[in-house]
Amino acid sequence: MKKLRLLCIPPYEGMYNLMTNIAAQRSDVELIIHMGNLEDGLRAVLENRDNNIDAVISRGGTAETIRAHCSDIPACDIIPSVYDVLRTIRLAQSMSDKLAVVGFPSITKPADMLRDIMQYDFKVRTIRSGAECEACLRQLRDEGIQVIAGDMISVTCAQKLGMNGLLIVSGIESV
């Protein structure tokens, strides 16, 4: 039986390590792993296009970027579980009651659901591109938000703006 060849593009080191461990345990799948975020992930797909890749696995904005530019290769999105989001929100709440979740839809949908179910008081902002992120975070900072929970682009941008950024990490169940 032919091995399935998957190009995995984790946006952060912890997910890279998790994918490497999963790859070591699977004999039916060949995982090619390149760490990257947004355009870096797209570049990895373009560089590996001739390597007979069956599908791409990534998260959030990186998966969306790949789908938008490479319609000939299926791109699967790792969606954080509600528990992944809850874990980060609880940590953020211990830092400040002025917090927001910012990210691509795969991050903000579970956050919205969690906010409604648990009746938590935090803002949720969905972005569609890296370019939108800074303006969104500046507005939240002007509204008094101190802590941002989100994806790689949101956390990196928040830290550049002097805000606290907490990455919502995906557990092994999500990956």
Walk through the language-model features, giving the residues of each.
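Non-catalytic structural scaffold of enzyme domains
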Residues: 1-175
